[in-house]
Regions:
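FIC/Doc superfamily catalytic core
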Residues: 1-183
Length: 183
């Protein structure tokens, strides 16, 4: 594991262990930025800052930087009353990809906060297969049913279970290609 990733993973653990997670605004851009700063402050000079450059990954171009601020306002206003609405908001935020780096790890924590606040559930990420998840995310801008079906299968009401939280954080980093054994 690269040192930046290791430090960021430690920061993610600390976000929960310190109780700082409870001070984060749920479902807002400000909350998303707060999580990003917590994970990446001192690691990236752009921690918590909305990107001003266009980015792409695997041939997919994320929202154009020129319109990003307007898009983020619209996403923040999206409803969060049901599982479907919450996942739709998550998909739109993924398409926006507001940061230069660290979007996935940040947004999965953000998603769980929204699910916890509105549905009293979180995703038990340790059981969500990496390739199925990444495939569903890749297809989600066109059709998010695959993602909704996959994540709904692993919802749990055990929202304060430390093992579920920390295994989920590790799985989130694994999705991005980081493994503890890489040290």
């Amino acid at each position: 594991m690269k040192s930046i990733d290791k430090k960021s993973l430690e920061n993610a653990y600390r976000l929960f262990e310190s109780g700082a997670i409870s001070s984060i605004e749920v479902g807002t851009l400000k909350g998303l930025q707060h999580i990003h700063v917590f994970l990446f402050d001192t690691l990236y000079d752009f921690a918590g800052k909305i990107r001003t450059q266009n980015i792409s990954k695997g041939g997919f171009r994320f929202a154009t930087a020129l319109y990003l601020n307007e898009i983020l306002v619209k996403i923040e206003q999206m409803p969060e009353n049901s599982f479907d609405e919450i996942i739709s908001k998550y998909v739109e935020m993924n398409i926006a990809h507001p940061f230069l780096e660290g979007n996935g790890r940040t947004m999965r924590i953000w998603l769980d906060l929204i699910l916890k606040a509105n549905l009293k559930k979180v995703v038990n990420w340790q059981f969500v297969d990496k390739s199925l998840y990444l495939q569903a995310m890749e297809r989600s801008p066109i059709n998010d049913l695959e993602l909704k079906t996959l994540l709904q299968k692993y919802l749990t009401e055990d929202v304060n279970n430390r093992e579920i939280i920390f295994k989920g954080i590790e799985q989130s980093y694994y999705y991005e290609g980081y493994e503890k054994d890489d040290e």
